[in-house]
């Protein structure tokens, strides 16, 4: 038959829609999916005679014999070499601004950078003040944090678009550590008693000159800056030792669930400000539930003025935020609603004398200028060292993921290692200037990108806006109610809380990811932020192990007129050769799933142990001359075969999906091969990757004369099996 007269062979899915046939070029292969898994072995006779298939021989590359000592010496020599070129590259690599700033296109980019920097700066002013409360700090420290982070990332960062500064989840984690250490030190956690003269519901002694006395606010920033310093050290160390792989264990589902769970805790911590209640911040396991219990127990003490102010701010902020998102493609810049609300609320509080008349909680005095730098408290390091680990991992994971996301979107590359250095120094250096932990923030990054940002020069503009506030405008926020700041914080949680909308889609795509999301979210919200992250990571790793412990297995069939093998449980019209079964195991073979591998292989083919036992039993009964049918054993091992099990002569194990073997995996393959050979069935391995081949060689799976049991393709293994059966005089009606 000529090639022109042949029709293309089409394998269509069993669950395909009938009557929807479309013409396909003859060169295309179409597989028809099975409706449900099946182990029926349908035989299709082939008209072509058996043709020889030559063995493939490949010579492996020679491996270098460099030992560990030589490797270390070589690396040290390479790292310790010094030359002007290498010194220049090192400096330019550490300070990326030296690379891109001389090439900066002023006419093309300056307008977008100035606009985006100004807008982000305007948004950061109220958010920095609001998030300071979340971190248990004075408003001035939030402004310091955003200012220094913007400048340092401008010098060290490789992303053109991300906005580095305060981030709600990190502020929450810092605040929990601060409250715990304040409680240990004997400070009152109900009233905020700043050392800079801020007005509070409680009375405290103020001290700005004596180093011997440190009030609550002073001690709070000591704790915050010490945690920040340690988190930065961890991040720089991870960059130096190139252990950024840690972020691999923080999947998108895990991070999303963690942020959503933490958002509930943030919302809960800010609810007292909306109601004007003076409550201690609950910490530890179940803090969210404890806080709500305290709120409802004290609900009768609600400050009506604060409540009305909160409702009015919500009525303004929520709709305008939604309008900003809905019309962001038409708006050249988002409406700075938060700043408008802050200004209006400050004026209303000042001229209405709300604090004097209704005892509302206000921000109080915010000083201008900068405080002298001060080192973190080294005595606190043992107490906060563990807390800083989780904070550092979350900070760099979010920063690196956002950097890579926006770099991919805009067609440039970022250096993940340099990003860890950048965010690390954004924490180390500001920790000496009374700042707390920072990272990239998605909401502000989206605003920055949508308003025309082209480079990190926009970060300088943001810093200039904050500098203006720090030097001139800050005292004007004296009468700003804390309830307004709480509303701003809660409104900015909308993005994280909207993740619930994505759950149906996530469930359809991956049920395992959805379960990880729920476990992480619930544990972060109901147990604690740090334990929630740990539980999420452990559960995520458990899910990975579970997937490899119960992997997918299938028997393969040949696609007609090709050398392609596919799962017979997934596709129709596949050829199964008599006497040969091809088994695929889709997972690494190691100690966790070795028993699953054996049981699945025995179920899909036959159990050699039971067959051997039946043969011995038959021999004792002296019925060797009669054929052994083993019909009872077939039922016992649940194998549905369309022919006598003992007609099976060869099992080919497709190793293409086996990424690696450990010692237990090699022993399992040896055991399986030995058991099958005991009943006259040969076992062949096909498509082993170089790593698996190397493991088999080191594990002495094959002797020198048995190297022919390893094949580079399944088709080659099948051809070898049929040839060996023909040589033994076994009738094979269908050749390859």
From Swiss-Prot:
Report the residues modified as Phosphoserine: 12, 16
Q: Which cysteines are joined by disulfide bonds?
A: none
Q: What is its main location?
A: membrane
| Residue segments, region Disordered | 1-28
Q: Which GO terms describe its cellular component?
A: apical plasma membrane; plasma membrane
Where are the annotated coiled coils located? Answer: none
- In what residue span(s) does the STAS domain sit? 570-721
**Membrane topology value:** Multi-pass membrane protein
Q: Where in the cell is it found?
A: Cell membrane; Apical cell membrane
Q: How is it modified after translation?
A: N-glycosylated.
- Specify the glycosylation sites in chain numbering: 201, 207
One biological process term from GO is: chondrocyte differentiation
Q: Which keywords describe this protein according to UniProt?
A: Cell membrane, Glycoprotein, Membrane, Phosphoprotein, Transmembrane, Transmembrane helix, Transport
Q: Which domain of life is it from?
A: Eukaryota
Q: Which reaction does it catalyse?
A: oxalate(in) + sulfate(out) = oxalate(out) + sulfate(in); sulfate(out) + 2 chloride(in) = sulfate(in) + 2 chloride(out); oxalate(out) + 2 chloride(in) = oxalate(in) + 2 chloride(out); bromide(in) + chloride(out) = bromide(out) + chloride(in)
* Keyword Transmembrane helix carried by entry: yes
Q: What does this protein do?
A: Sulfate transporter which mediates sulfate uptake into chondrocytes in order to maintain adequate sulfation of proteoglycans which is needed for cartilage development. Mediates electroneutral anion exchange of sulfate ions for oxalate ions, sulfate and oxalate ions for chloride and/or hydroxyl ions and chloride ions for bromide, iodide and nitrate ions.
| NCBIfam families reported in the protein's UniProt record | sulP (TIGR00815)
Family as reported in the entry's similarity comment: Belongs to the SLC26A/SulP transporter (TC 2.A.53) family.
Q: What is this protein called?
A: Sulfate transporter
Source species: Equus caballus
What is the taxonomic lineage of the source species? Eukaryota, Metazoa, Chordata, Craniata, Vertebrata
Q: Which gene is annotated as encoding this protein in its UniProt record?
A: SLC26A2
């Amino acid at each position: 038959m000529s090639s022109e007269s042949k029709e293309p062979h089409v394998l269509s899915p069993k669950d395909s829609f009938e009557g929807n046939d479309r013409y396909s070029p003859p060169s295309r292969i179409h597989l028809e999916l099975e409706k449900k898994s099946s182990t029926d072995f349908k035989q299709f006779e082939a008209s072509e005679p058996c043709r020889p298939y030559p063995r493939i021989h490949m010579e492996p590359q020679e491996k270098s014999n460099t030992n560990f000592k030589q490797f270390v010496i070589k690396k040290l020599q390479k790292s310790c070499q010094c030359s002007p070129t290498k010194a220049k590259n090192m400096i330019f690599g550490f300070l990326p601004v030296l690379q891109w700033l001389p090439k900066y296109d002023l006419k093309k980019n300056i307008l977008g950078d100035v606009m985006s920097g100004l807008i982000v700066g305007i948004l950061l002013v109220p958010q920095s003040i609001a998030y300071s409360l979340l971190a248990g700090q004075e408003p001035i420290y939030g402004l310091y944090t955003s200012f220094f982070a913007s400048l340092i990332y401008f010098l060290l960062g490789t992303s053109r678009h991300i906005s580095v500064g305060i981030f709600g989840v990190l502020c929450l984690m810092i605040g929990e550590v601060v409250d715990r250490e304040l409680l240990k030190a004997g400070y009152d956690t109900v009233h905020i008693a700043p050392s800079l003269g801020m007005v509070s519901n409680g009375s405290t002694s103020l001290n700005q000159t004596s180093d011997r006395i440190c009030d609550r606010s002073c001690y709070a920033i000591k704790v915050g800056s010490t945690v920040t310093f340690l988190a930065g050290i961890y991040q720089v160390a991870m960059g130096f030792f190139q252990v950024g792989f840690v972020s691999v264990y923080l999947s998108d589902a895990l991070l999303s669930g963690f942020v959503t769970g933490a958002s509930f805790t943030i919302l809960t911590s800010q609810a007292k400000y909306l109601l004007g209640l003076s409550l201690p911040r609950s910490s530890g396991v179940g803090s969210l539930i404890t806080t709500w219990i305290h709120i409802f127990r004290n609900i009768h003490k609600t400050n009506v003025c604060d409540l009305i102010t909160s409702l009015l701010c919500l009525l303004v902020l929520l709709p305008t935020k939604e309008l900003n998102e809905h019309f962001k493609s038409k708006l050249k810049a988002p409406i700075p609603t938060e700043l408008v609300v802050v200004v209006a609320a400050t004026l209303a509080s000042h001229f209405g004398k709300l604090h004097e008349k209704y005892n509302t909680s206000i921000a109080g005095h915010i000083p201008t200028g900068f405080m002298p730098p001060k080192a973190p408290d080294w005595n606190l390091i043992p107490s906060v060292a563990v807390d800083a680990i989780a904070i550092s991992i979350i900070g760099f994971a979010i920063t690196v993921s956002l950097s890579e996301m926006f770099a991919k979107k805009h067609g440039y590359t970022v250096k993940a290692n340099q990003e860890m250095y950048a965010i690390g120094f954004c924490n180390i250096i500001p920790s000496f200037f009374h700042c707390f932990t920072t990272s990239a923030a998605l909401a502000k990054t989206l605003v920055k990108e949508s308003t025309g940002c082209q480079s990190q020069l926009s970060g300088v503009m943001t810093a200039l806006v904050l500098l203006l506030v720090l030097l001139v405008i800050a005292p004007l926020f004296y009468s700003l109610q804390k309830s307004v700041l709480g509303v701003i914080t809660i409104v900015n949680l909308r993005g994280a809380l909207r993740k619930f909308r994505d759950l149906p889609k996530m469930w359809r795509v991956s049920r395992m990811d959805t379960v990880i999301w729920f476990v992480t979210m619930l544990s972060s919200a109901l147990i604690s932020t740090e334990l929630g992250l740990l539980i999420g990571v452990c559960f995520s790793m458990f899910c990975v192990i579970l997937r490899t412990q119960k992997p997918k297995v299938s028997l393969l069939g040949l696609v007609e007129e090709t050398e392609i093998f596919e799962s017979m449980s997934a596709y129709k019209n596949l050829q199964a050769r008599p006497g040969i079964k091809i088994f695929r195991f889709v997972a690494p073979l190691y100690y966790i799933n070795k028993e699953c591998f054996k049981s699945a292989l025995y179920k899909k083919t036959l159990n050699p142990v039971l067959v051997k036992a039946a043969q011995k039993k038959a021999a004792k009964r002296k019925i060797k001359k009669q054929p052994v049918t083993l019909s009872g054993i077939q039922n016992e091992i649940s194998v549905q075969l369309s022919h006598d099990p003992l007609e099976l002569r060869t099992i080919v194990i497709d190793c293409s999906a086996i990424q690696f073997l450990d010692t237990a995996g090699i022993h399992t393959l040896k055991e399986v091969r030995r058991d099958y050979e005991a009943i006259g069935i040969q076992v062949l391995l096909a498509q082993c990757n170089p790593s698996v081949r190397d493991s088999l060689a080191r594990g002495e799976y094959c002797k020198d004369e048995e190297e022919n049991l390893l094949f580079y393709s399944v088709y080659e293994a099948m051809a070898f099996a049929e040839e060996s059966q023909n040589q033994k005089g076994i009738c094979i009606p269908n050749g390859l």
